[in-house]
């Protein structure tokens, strides 16, 4: 497995971890604040994750950053979040990572970093 394939595998694993977390949360938890952290509510965190996935995936496809946008209009509704997480996972997996340029690889690493940073914030739920 080359580096590009490893990067895609790590993105897939990070995406699955996010999905699994949301799957196991009660919908009421989406309105909770993260303890001892000046941050968005969990729904806001998930909106940011989805927006980053959509925006970075588009940037990877286009070979350059095209700005941030998020289609998740209802981040407090668990089913909507799960469906959108599934859609962004599918979209990422449609990209052939073997032929990526250095710029595209950097964008993919930025997406991975963003997802993992949110994991670091969301794990505070478990305290």
Functional labels for PLM-detected ranges:
Residues 2, 19-29:
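His/Met- and acidic-residue-enriched segments that coordinate or traffic transition-metal cofactors
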Residues 26, 33, 93-96, 126:
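A structural signal for long alpha-helical coiled-coils and helix-turn connectors
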Residues 3-8, 75-78:
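Active-site rim elements
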Residues 58-92:
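Helix-adjacent hinge/juxtasegments
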Residues 28, 86-101:
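Acidic catalytic patch
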Residues 8-12, 16-19, 30-68, 101-127:
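Short, contiguous alpha-helical
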């Amino acid at each position: 497995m080359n580096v590009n394939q490893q990067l895609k595998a790590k993105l897939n694993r990070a995406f699955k971890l996010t999905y699994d977390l949301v799957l196991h949360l009660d919908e009421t938890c989406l309105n909770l604040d993260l303890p001892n952290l000046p941050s968005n509510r969990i729904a806001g965190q998930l909106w940011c994750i989805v927006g980053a996935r959509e925006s970075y995936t588009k940037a990877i496809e286009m070979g350059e950053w095209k700005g941030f946008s998020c289609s998740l209009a209802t981040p407090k509704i668990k089913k909507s979040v799960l469906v959108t997480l599934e859609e962004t996972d599918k979209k990422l997996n449609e990209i052939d990572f073997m032929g990526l340029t250095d710029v595209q690889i950097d964008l993919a690493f930025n997406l991975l970093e963003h997802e993992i940073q949110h994991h670091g914030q969301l794990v505070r739920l478990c305290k």
